[in-house]
A protein has these predicted regions:
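A generic, well-ordered mixed alpha/beta core segment in the N-terminal half of proteins
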Residues: 80-129
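Hydrophobic alpha-helical segments, principally membrane-spanning helices and signal/leader peptides
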Residues: 1, 29-30, 102, 107
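A generic local secondary-structure boundary/capping motif
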Residues: 1-3, 130-131
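Conserved small/polar residues in nucleotide/adenosyl-binding loops
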Residues: 135-138
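An N-terminal structural lobe/cap that precedes and organizes the functional/catalytic core
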Residues: 2-83
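Phosphate-rich cofactor/ligand-interacting catalytic cores and adjacent structured alpha/beta frameworks
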Residues: 143
């Protein structure tokens, strides 16, 4: 893969939609998002990122370094588990971190090298902790 980008880049996407809905609001029955003052349609950054992800996925078709991490209907832990397996890391990350303190950097580098959208937009990565948090009203009464 080529040298990573060292600078930050901002971009603007201008497009025109006539008789369409480029970014429906799921909380409002998929109605178009509209600026109440101007009457112009609004498109969120999330929508633009999805359009870019879809374009790159279509153009590159899983080419090395251009895979997409955030896919509709695909759990993120599949890609996380693949990274752990490929790097030969113990799935028990607490034990793995004791053995190798640089494990976070290795995981970050792997994910950035393989996933276009992580490199481009960044990502909040999991801590790979399995399990659930249980909150009960009894716990609130104790405080």
């Amino acid at each position: 893969m080529s040298e990573p980008i060292k600078n930050r880049y901002d971009f603007v996407i201008l497009f025109d939609v006539e008789n369409g809905n480029p970014n429906g609001d799921p909380d409002a029955g998929n109605m178009p998002r509209i600026d109440p003052e101007t009457g112009y349609g609004l498109v969120t950054d999330v929508c633009l990122k999805r359009k870019i992800r879809n374009y790159v996925e279509t153009l590159k078709e899983d080419e090395k370094g251009y895979r997409i991490y955030i896919k509709d209907g695909v759990p993120l832990n599949r890609s996380d588990a693949e990274a752990i397996s490929t790097l030969g890391i113990d799935p028990d990350l607490k034990a793995a971190k004791k053995a190798d303190p640089d494990i976070d950097a290795k995981l970050r580098d792997y994910m950035c090298a393989n996933y276009f959208d992580i490199r481009t937009f960044g990502a909040v990565m999991t801590t790979f902790v399995k399990g659930c948090l249980l909150y009960t009203s009894d716990a609130a009464d104790d405080s």
